[in-house]
């Protein structure tokens, strides 16, 4: 069972437990052990306590510089990382891609060289090409935190999803967690499959055939607890957690869907469908939500929704990642 610290008294315990952290970068969750995932959860619990204090700031990363490098638009993720860095007293360098040398054709590696020359100790990056953060990690000295690369991965989102579930459930072991939406093109889904599996959850992926991942079958060797489903009623039945995923409009243009309304008719999580889940089931979504398409408006704002809590917890989880990767010994 994962213990999430909820009081300041746990800080000393945390400092003695996180010394075994080995990762310089956070690129995805495939190379994280169960123990390392637990370590992130424990650290995030302490960070969440810090954020509840009158002064929401500690000097753990004072003197460090964290750069944000986003090649794709982002509001909540970029703001969350920036607030996390500032809450640890780090200096933040925001690079505006549209107004930088990148818009003139500067390469990723040249941009990273520039950021390192400016003193960046860590770089949070989002890139449209899968694998770009790995290229960065192999070619610069700064810590790289992947804030989303192509269809590949979004590890901090998966970690905050796990953390949010653990704020309500004592363990993920044996929980039925259903993900509904564009699984095939969702970096959030891909990282969650790794993270939730390692935490012992039973995962159901629900989507039209055209939006289910190729090469992943029910009860596969790598993910024996993953089930693929095209019937939303079967997918949601008995679920402990139901997570909607953003339907990207460009998928309709590519011919993978007959239409947005057609999708909503068969795959929208509404109150009637939600009744098939357990009575205490959590409703989640990484955002932004297309209301009345992926989730009905009443479900988004209903009592079982923890979507706003996910946003809040995201800051604590990203603080934890900064803290752990920095090697800091103080909070």
Swiss-Prot record:
KW Transferase (keyword) present: yes
Pfam family, one: OTCace
Reactions it catalyzes: carbamoyl phosphate + L-aspartate = N-carbamoyl-L-aspartate + phosphate + H(+)
GO molecular function: amino acid binding; aspartate carbamoyltransferase activity
EC code: 2.1.3.2
Keyword Oxidoreductase part of the UniProt annotation: no
A GO CC annotation given for this chain: cytosol
Residues involved in L-aspartate binding: 104, 187, 246
InterPro entries (UniProt xref): Asp/Orn_carbamoyltranf_P-bd, Asp/Orn_carbamoylTrfase, Asp/Orn_carbamoylTrfase_sf, Asp_carbamoyltransf, Asp_carbamoyltransf_Asp/Orn-bd
Pathway where it operates: Pyrimidine metabolism; UMP biosynthesis via de novo pathway; (S)-dihydroorotate from bicarbonate: step 2/3
GO biological process, alphabetically ordered: 'de novo' pyrimidine nucleobase biosynthetic process; 'de novo' UMP biosynthetic process; amino acid metabolic process
Keywords of the record: Pyrimidine biosynthesis, Transferase
Binding site for carbamoyl phosphate: 76-77, 126, 154, 157, 287-288
Binding partners and assembly: Heterododecamer (2C3:3R2) of six catalytic PyrB chains organized as two trimers (C3), and six regulatory PyrI chains organized as three dimers (R2).
Protein's job: Catalyzes the condensation of carbamoyl phosphate and aspartate to form carbamoyl aspartate and inorganic phosphate, the committed step in the de novo pyrimidine nucleotide biosynthesis pathway.
Family: Belongs to the aspartate/ornithine carbamoyltransferase superfamily. ATCase family.
Protein name (record): Aspartate carbamoyltransferase catalytic subunit
């Amino acid at each position: 069972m994962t213990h999430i610290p909820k009081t300041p008294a746990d800080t000393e315990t945390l400092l003695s437990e996180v010394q075994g952290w080995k990762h310089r970068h956070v690129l995805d969750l495939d190379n994280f052990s169960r123990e390392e995932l637990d370590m992130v959860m424990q650290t995030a619990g302490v960070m969440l306590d810090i954020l509840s204090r009158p002064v929401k700031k500690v000097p753990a990363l004072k003197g460090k510089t964290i750069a944000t490098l986003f090649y794709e638009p982002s509001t909540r993720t970029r703001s969350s990382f920036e607030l996390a860095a500032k809450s640890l007293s780090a200096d933040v360098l925001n690079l505006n891609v549209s107004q930088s040398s990148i818009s003139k054709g500067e390469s990723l590696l040249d941009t990273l060289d520039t950021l390192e020359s400016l003193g960046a100790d860590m770089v949070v990056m989002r890139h449209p090409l899968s694998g770009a953060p790995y290229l960065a990690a192999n070619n610069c000295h700064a810590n790289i935190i992947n804030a989303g690369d192509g269809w590949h991965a979004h590890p901090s989102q998966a970690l905050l999803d796990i953390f949010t579930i653990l704020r309500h459930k004592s363990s993920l072991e044996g929980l039925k967690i259903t993900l509904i939406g564009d699984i095939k093109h969702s970096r959030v889904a891909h990282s969650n499959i790794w993270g939730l599996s390692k935490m012992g959850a039973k995962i159901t992926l629900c989507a039209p055939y055209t939006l289910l991942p190729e090469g992943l079958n029910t009860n596969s060797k790598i993910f024996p607890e993953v089930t693929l489903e095209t019937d939303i009623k079967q997918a949601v039945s008995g679920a402990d957690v139901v997570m909607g995923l953003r339907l990207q409009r460009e998928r309709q243009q590519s011919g993978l869907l007959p239409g947005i309304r057609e999708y909503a008719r068969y795959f929208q999580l509404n109150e009637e469908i939600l009744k098939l889940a357990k009575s205490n089931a959590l409703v989640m979504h990484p955002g932004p939500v297309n209301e009345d398409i992926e989730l009905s408006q009443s479900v988004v704002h209903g009592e079982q929704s923890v979507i706003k809590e996910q946003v809040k917890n995201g800051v604590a989880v990203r603080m934890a990642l900064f803290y752990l990767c920095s090697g800091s010994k103080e909070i």
